[in-house]
């Protein structure tokens, strides 16, 4: 019979890995609460139309990377490839525009993209993302970037750079796109096959290509900064002022773009300093037109997202110490059926008093139970045997200093509390 394994591009998160995941998730939530963000959870799947309208019909995400199927009613459904469009859909559906603006939300959830699996990149991956909807002021951009920076720094990832750019708005971007098309049309012979395809449907993405020949071309490509309207120039200038005010070490990168059509004005990424431009930990930007594209009123917004798997990869690479997960305080070993019943009762009593306890629940030898206790990392072992039952006592062993003593059964709670 063929062995069934996890699908390509996915990974089981085993107990031995959970300390990293708990560490990152908890710190993400704690950071969000410091900045006044509230958690939101949206469905794993949405109607496909949401991503076609929101992410962009011509994007590679929609064209090549989505997991899409018809459900039994014939509705086209897609496993979410990213978190921003679903949050914006929820913002509209639940009338959040009536709340004090900006509405500040965060999520920690899986996303699905059919991509070539590689180190730190999976077809199902976990994202931590934040969205601030309902404010155009560049100080909000600065706050989001500051929040992401403090998050990475707090985790221990200190050797990072912040890349920053403005890709303009609906008024000024068309002239920039035309300049890009004109420039690259003269150099199509040097473009990789993917960029030749992108030239007509998504010329911005040519600046983002990681192929060497395309990167060389990008160095001489037109700059978005030369095409910004006055409003976008002022917005970008103010943002840089606020980032300097917050002492954030940003670098302007004229080739920085994002892979989704909804981005406007500010775009940014965080990169490990030693790895170069192909290893972004996370990024984000403004999407001032997305709510309107989905049927709402014009509503400025900005967001940020980061892949948790990639964060953990960098934590391990930097050899950053992670707090261990809690282990049970007490292991209860026993000898005989009657002692087993007493062990069950005692374990229940300890748990009712918020003392974590485990027991073997099998017919292992005492030696095997002690090995299990040692492996579990418990601080104390309680042993119940025939003599202990007869005398209404237990044997208590401190696993740290190897001290052992006999105590009355009814003194256990007082001793452990």
Sequence positions of predicted segments:
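TRNA-recognition modules of translation machinery and tRNA-sensing kinases, especially anticodon-binding
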Residues: 1-372, 376-416
């Amino acid at each position: 019979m063929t062995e069934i394994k996890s699908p390509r591009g996915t990974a089981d998160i085993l107990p031995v890995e959970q300390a990293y995941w708990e560490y990152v998730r908890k710190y993400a939530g704690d950071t969000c609460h410091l900045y006044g963000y509230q958690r939101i959870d949206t469905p794993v799947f949405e109607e496909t139309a949401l991503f076609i309208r929101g992410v962009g019909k011509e994007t590679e995400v929609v064209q090549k990377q989505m997991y899409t199927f018809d459900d039994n009613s014939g509705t086209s459904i897609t496993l979410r490839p990213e978190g921003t469009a679903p949050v914006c859909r929820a913002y509209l559906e639940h009338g959040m525009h009536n709340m004090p603006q900006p509405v500040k939300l965060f999520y920690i959830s899986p996303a699905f993209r059919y991509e070539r699996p590689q180190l730190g990149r999976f077809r199902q991956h976990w994202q931590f993302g934040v969205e601030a909807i309902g404010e155009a002021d560049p100080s909000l951009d600065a706050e989001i970037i500051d929040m992401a920076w403090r998050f990475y720094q707090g985790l221990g990832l200190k050797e990072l750079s912040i890349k920053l750019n403005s890709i303009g708005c609906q008024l000024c971007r068309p002239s920039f796109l035309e300049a890009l098309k004109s420039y690259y049309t003269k150099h199509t012979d040097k473009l990789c096959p993917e960029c030749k395809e992108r030239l007509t449907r998504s010329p911005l993405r040519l600046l983002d290509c990681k192929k060497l020949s395309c990167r060389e071309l990008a160095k001489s490509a037109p700059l978005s900064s030369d095409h910004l309207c006055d409003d976008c120039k002022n917005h970008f200038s103010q943002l840089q002022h606020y980032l300097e005010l917050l002492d954030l070490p940003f670098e302007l990168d004229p080739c920085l773009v994002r892979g989704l059509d909804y981005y406007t004005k500010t775009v940014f990424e965080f990169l490990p300093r030693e790895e170069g431009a192909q290893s972004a930990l996370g990024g984000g930007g403004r999407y001032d037109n997305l709510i309107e594209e989905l049927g709402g009123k014009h509503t400025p917004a900005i967001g940020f997202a980061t892949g948790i798997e990639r964060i953990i990869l960098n934590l391990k690479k930097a050899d950053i110490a992670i707090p261990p997960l809690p282990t049970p305080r007490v292991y209860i070993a026993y000898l005989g059926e009657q002692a087993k019943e007493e062990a069950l009762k005692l374990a229940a009593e300890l748990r009712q008093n918020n003392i974590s306890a485990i027991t073997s629940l099998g017919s292992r030898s005492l030696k095997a139970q002690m090995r299990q206790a040692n492996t579990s990392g418990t601080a104390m072992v309680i042993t119940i045997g025939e003599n202990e039952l007869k005398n209404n006592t237990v044997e208590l062993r401190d696993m740290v200093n190897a001290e052992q003593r006999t105590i009355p059964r009814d003194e256990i709670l007082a001793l452990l509390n």
